[in-house]
Design a protein with these regions (language model features):
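N-terminal cap/lid segment of alpha/beta-hydrolase-fold proteins
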Residues: 27-89
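Short beta-strand element of the alpha/beta-hydrolase
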Residues: 91-99
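Active-site glycine-rich loops that stabilize anionic/oxyanionic intermediates
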Residues: 98-110
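Conserved alpha/beta-hydrolase
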Residues: 114-140
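Conserved acidic catalytic loop of the alpha/beta-hydrolase fold
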Residues: 195-216
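Gly/Ala-rich beta-loop-alpha elbow adjacent to hydrolase catalytic centers
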Residues: 218-227
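The feature captures the conserved acid-bearing segment of alpha/beta-hydrolase catalytic domains
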Residues: 247-324, 328-330
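Catalytic active-site module of serine/aspartate enzymes centered on a nucleophile-bearing elbow/loop
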Residues: 339, 343-367
């Protein structure tokens, strides 16, 4: 009869462990995103200086209470860019620009822990560039001072971002009911570290496209209007996909619509020359809006301001298209996607939202 020693059992156990580990690796590799390269850089920016002479001996020690700035410079007001290039990448990258009070976190892991647009489109072999605009997030080095408020305003943004009213989620909303998800959502808000400067922001993002070449700009909310202005500056922007642009719509001189009133405010458009405006007729553009946006004025300001934005966006689409442009506006409930907040890219149905964009890119020959 064969005798089994403890050494024999150890060898068998080791072999089984190795086999299990290898099989696990094979299974998990199906979900691996393989990158050719990744990295980061800054784009745009300014340099300011203080007159005088810097004395590296007398003034070379860090002394916050009595620090001389004479003869020194400050590099700031740039965008910060993080990029990932997948293996066998598609030719045109997607450049993702966040909205007001946000950073590149908008496009990364969702508040409830699922993959965001960053990974979703990497899996589709698109090069992905995420940016923090000047004076925001990782681009916080500002050449102008500001005061950062510590106001308690979470519930204000809960309503404006159309998660619900007060602290109650809308019925059927595409946001996780788990308290931890809402906690994560609130914590992705981030302040401006300097005065908001539209021209500064658009120059920085234009410089980004100067660096990377042709690509597709994907904007959200406040960056929507800045996206149109950036396209006026840079022919490397081959298309724009805009999620819930809230303001900053530009029309040809003489065709600016009347302001659209909403609760406690009014949405105004601005004018550019017809020559500048024609640039927006030369590229395909798609605009997406989510749910819980009324057709008529309502008392809820968190909904009513988006009614004004959607109304203005429709007028803008019509003006661009009348001049030979190619603007598509998609109201998600009208195509069967209900419950979306102001953040469709991180909502529970973000895979379906991403599929709409993927299909549009293919339809326009941008894939």
């Amino acid at each position: 009869m064969m005798q089994f020693t403890s050494s024999y059992f150890r060898q068998v156990l080791l072999a089984l462990c190795v086999a299990f580990a290898l099989s696990s690796c094979v299974i998990s590799r199906e979900n691996v995103i393989v990158l050719e390269r990744q990295g980061s850089f800054t784009a745009g920016g300014t340099v300011i200086s203080t007159p005088g002479t810097f004395d590296s001996i007398a003034d070379g020690a860090f002394s916050p209470a009595d620090q001389s700035t004479a003869g020194q410079t400050l590099h700031g007001d740039h965008a910060f860019v993080f990029y990932q290039i997948p293996v066998d990448a598609r030719p045109l990258p997607l450049v993702f620009w966040h909205g007001y009070g946000q950073s590149m976190k908008t496009w990364q892991t969702t508040p409830d822990g699922r993959e965001g647009f960053q990974n979703i489109f990497l899996r589709q072999r698109y090069p992905v560039y995420l940016l923090d605009q000047p004076r925001r997030g990782q681009a916080g080095r500002s050449t102008e001072p500001t005061t950062i408020s510590a106001a308690t305003n979470d519930q204000l943004w809960f309503g404006i971002f159309r998660l619900g009213v007060g602290s109650e989620l809308y019925p059927g909303v595409q946001f996780s009911p788990e308290p931890a998800a809402l906690d994560q959502f609130y914590r992705q808000m981030t302040p401006d570290t300097g005065p908001l400067n539209i021209e500064l922001n658009t120059k920085a993002v234009s410089a980004l496209f100067d660096t990377i070449g042709p690509g597709i700009l994907v904007t959200h909310s406040h960056s929507g209007g800045m996206g149109w202005l950036t396209a006026l500056k840079n022919d490397n922007i081959m298309a724009i996909a805009s999620y819930e642009p809230g303001s900053g719509f530009v029309f040809p001189e003489g065709e600016v619509p009347e302001p659209i009133p909403y609760v406690r405010g009014a949405l105004r458009a601005s004018a550019v020359s017809l020559e500048e405006f024609r640039r927006l007729t030369e590229i395909p553009i798609v605009i997406y809006y989510g749910d819980n946006i009324p057709n008529q004025p309502v008392e809820n300001p968190g909904q009513d301001q988006w009614r004004a934005s959607l109304t203005m966006a429709k007028a803008w689409r019509d003006v661009v298209n009348r001049r030979g442009g190619d603007v598509t506006l998609v109201h998600l409930p009208e195509v069967g996607l209900t419950g979306n907040t102001h953040f469709p890219m991180s909502d529970l149905n973000n895979l379906a939202v991403a599929e709409l964009l993927s299909n549009w890119l293919k339809e326009k020959g941008l894939d």
